[in-house]
Every structure is written in structure tokens, then in C-alpha cells.
From Swiss-Prot:
Identification of the protein by name: L-rhamnose isomerase
Binding-site residues for Mn(2+), renumbered to this chain: H262, D294, D296
Species annotation: Shigella flexneri serotype 5b (strain 8401)
Entry's localization field: Cytoplasm
Cofactor note: Binds 1 Mn(2+) ion per subunit.
Main location: cytoplasm
Domain of life: Bacteria
Keyword line: Cytoplasm, Isomerase, Manganese, Metal-binding, Rhamnose metabolism
Length: 419
């Protein structure tokens, strides 16, 4: 007997075929686009190095929803619960502070062995891993400078941390058969009027060159650098600005990270993708939702998320753009936050794949902007939800909001016991 979902699917196939879209091919393409989930949503960026310490670096996780992960086992269990509710390929993005060791490890001494459990877990769950050095929440970052620090010994500490992190990243790629994207973000900047804006950038330039001096297999490891407009306590000057890192990534041919919350509120990263791709080999995206500032709210299926996805698909950037998420909301159930944000990113990608882009390009090239706008708007009414629901069914995940029941059950059975 044909189910309601199957009936809707068959009708959707016909509707999309009428405008030249093969929905089966769209689903195949969607499975080529993994989304890298960020581990730090699960514990408010606490990590395991000093979980009771303060979060610094001009970033904030606001809220105090009960049940946050307190150790690696709890965090992995929470991630597994979230991933069961998200269809399609996924990766996990780790920060260096999520190492596991029985004894304290200085950040400039981290080694692959400190992340062995993560690798074994990733193998068991068929995941790729990505990585980040953690240049914040540390005594040697307390004055607001790391890789651009004027003190040679402190700057060298952070250089060594980033070099050690690259080796961890390469280990991930070698073990898992998929390259690890390692993103360098630093909080360096000043609160008030800065007289010498050049010297810190000169130091950062030299430091980064030393960091990436060791040649690593690009099949295992990809370097990325990330700019930011400002942070709390660094409102007036950020060393690693957009211009700095665009120049660095272009001249050194590293990947460039574009974070949706790291620009002026009137700027959008969807418009930056096609420009940056002319100069850099690869892009890393941190899809987020800034509310008035880099607040890292949970990603919505909104215009900008859709525009980001559409840029990737329209320009066939599957092999040059790495999609990551970066938000941390401690005011709601953290597992639900992962599920909502990641599903929304995947929905946006699917919608982009269901767009009649070839026809739209023809209209645009012909100068028929009336028809272009009309078709762009009319295609929004096509039965995309039926295609999404079939995709979820094929990946054995809930199609609609019933996933929330699973989260609530997990919260009652597991999270509520954490205190």
C-alpha cells in the first residue's frame, strides 16, 4: 500500500520534472555535501582542559540550560543522539581544548595521542574530523594577544600550539581518509584607540608563516585562516581583519574561513563566496546567525542561510567549499540546537539543488529580469518538503518535528541526571 509520504514524493517528482529538475539527482548531490558539526555547542565551549575556567577571547555562551556535557563520554553520547536525528553525511569539528589526558598537557605539547579516542569514535560513526587550535581561555591569552603578542616567548608558545595542532589535524586526515580542515582564529586586538596597528600585523604575518612552514600532505590536512570584525574587549582593533586574512590566504594559497557573524551587520558572507573563490583555492564556511553582533545564535532556514547554500550549488563549489557550523546557545537544549541548526543547513542545500538554475541563468543572460524574478519566486512554492521527507526516510531519520520527542526522551533519561 502506498504511503502518504510516497504519494507526496511521486507528485513532487512530477512537479519538479516539469521544470527540468531530477529530484533523485538532487538527493545524490546532497549526499556529496557533508556538514561539519561543531563540538562546542555541547558544553558551551568549556572543553576538558579546564572546564571550570572562564570563556575568554571576546566570545560568549549565554544561558544556563541544564544537562550540558561534562566530559568526553557525555559529549560523544550527546553528539550521537543529535546525529541520529540529522540525515546525510556529517563531520565533527573539534577544538584543541577537547583533548583527553590523565595528566595536564600544555597546549604547545598536544599530540595525536590525546585525540585517539575521538578518532576511534569517528571511525565507528563514519565521520570525518576537522580541527582548531584553541587560542583563548588561557593565562597566556589573558592580555588579548596570542600569535601577534609582543613578547617573543608568549608568541612562540602560541606558534608552537598551532604547529602541534596541525600535526593533530594531519593525523585525523591520515586515519580517517578524508582531509581535516584546521582553522586558525585568534582573538588578538585592543579595546580602545590603537596607535600602532601595523606592528601586531607584522608579527602575526611572520608567526603564521612559521606555523605553516612544515609541509603536510594536503590529502590529510588543509590550513584555513579566519578574520573577525571585533570581539568583546577588542572593539577598536582586531589584528586578524578581513583584509589581513584575505591577503594572507591569497598570497599563501591557504583556505579562507568566512564566518557569518564576523563582519559588519550589513555584510553577508554569501556575497563574499564568489569573490574569494577567484583568489583562494578553498573556502571554509562557518554558518552562524549573528543577532546585532557575533552572537552565534542557532542557524535558521532564513534568507542568508539559503543564499549561502545557493552560492555553493549554483557555482558547483562542492569540492572547494567546506561547510561548517559555529553557534553556541546555552539557553536551550543543546542537542536540539545542533539538530535545528544542522537540519536547517541541509534543508537550504536541498532547496538550492532543487532550483531550476540553468533556466534562471538563461533568463539572466537574456536580460529578462522580469521572468528571472518571477521564476525565482514561483519555484519557492514547489513541493520541496516532500523531497526533504523522502531524504530523511532514506537516511532513517525523522522527517518532521517528531525528532523533538526523541530529544525530550533523552533529556529526561540522561541529561536530567547530570545536575
Amino acid at each position: 500500500m502506498t504511503t502518504q509520504l510516497e504519494q507526496a514524493w511521486e507528485l513532487a517528482k512530477q512537479r519538479f520534472a516539469a521544470v527540468g529538475i531530477d529530484v533523485e539527482e538532487a538527493l545524490r548531490q546532497l549526499d556529496r555535501l557533508p556538514v561539519s558539526m561543531h563540538c562546542w555547542q555541547g558544553d558551551d565551549v568549556s572543553g576538558f582542559e579546564n572546564p571550570e575556567g572562564s570563556l575568554t577571547g571576546g566570545i560568549q555562551a549565554t544561558g544556563n540550560y541544564p544537562g550540558k556535557a561534562r566530559n568526553a563520554s557525555e559529549l560523544r553520547a550527546d553528539l550521537e543522539q543529535a546525529m541520529r536525528l540529522i540525515p546525510g553525511p556529517k563531520r565533527l569539528n573539534l577544538h584543541a581544548i577537547y583533548l583527553e589526558s590523565d595528566t595536564p598537557v600544555s597546549r604547545d605539547q598536544i599530540k595525536p595521542e590525546h585525540f585517539k579516542n575521538w578518532v576511534e569514535w569517528a571511525k565507528a560513526n563514519q565521520l570525518g574530523l576537522d580541527f582548531n587550535p584553541s587560542c583563548f581561555s588561557h593565562p597566556l591569552s589573558a592580555d588579548g594577544f596570542t600569535l601577534s603578542h609582543p613578547d617573543d616567548s608568549i608568541r612562540q608558545f602560541w606558534i608552537d600550539h598551532c604547529k602541534a595542532s596541525r600535526r593533530v589535524s594531519a593525523y585525523f586526515g591520515e586515519q580517517l581518509g578524508t582531509p581535516s580542515v584546521m582553522n586558525i582564529w585568534i582573538p588578538d586586538g585592543m579595546k580602545d584607540i590603537t596607535v600602532d596597528r601595523l606592528a601586531p600585523r607584522q608579527r602575526l604575518l611572520a608567526a603564521l608563516d612559521e606555523v605553516i612552514s612544515e609541509k603536510l600532505n594536503p590529502a590529510h590536512h588543509i590550513d584555513a585562516v579566519e578574520s573577525k570584525l571585533f570581539g568583546i574587549g577588542a572593539e577598536s582593533y582586531t589584528v586578524g581583519s578581513n583584509e589581513f586574512y584575505m591577503g594572507y590566504a591569497t598570497s599563501r594559497q591557504t583556505a579562507l574561513c568566512l564566518d557569518a557573524g564576523h563582519f559588519h551587520p550589513t555584510e553577508v558572507i554569501s556575497d563574499k563566496i564568489s569573490a574569494a573563490m577567484l583568489y583562494v583555492p578553498q573556502l571554509l564556511l562557518h554558518v552562524s546567525r549573528p543577532v546585532r553582533w557575533d552572537s552565534d545564535h542557532v542557524v535558521l532556514l532564513d534568507d542568508e542561510t539559503q543564499a549561502i547554500a545557493s552560492e555553493i550549488v549554483r557555482h558547483d563549489l562542492f569540492d572547494r567549499v567546506h561547510i561548517g557550523l559555529d553557534f553556541f546557545d546555552a539557553s536551550i537544549n543543546r542537542i536540539a540546537a545542533w539538530v535545528i541548526g544542522t537540519r536547517n543547513m541541509k534543508k537550504a542545500l536541498l532547496r538550492a539543488l532543487l532550483e531550476p538554475t540553468a533556466e534562471l541563468r538563461k533568463l539572466e543572460a537574456a536580460g529578462d529580469y522580469t521572468a528571472r524574478l518571477a521564476l525565482l519566486e514561483e519555484q519557492k512554492s514547489l513541493p520541496r518538503q516532500a523531497v526533504w521527507e523522502m531524504y530523511c526516510q532514506r537516511h532513517d531519520t525523522p522527517a518532521g518535528s517528531e525528532w523533538l520527542e526523541s530529544v525530550r526522551a533523552y533529556e529526561k533519561a540522561i541529561l536530567s541526571q547530570r545536575g
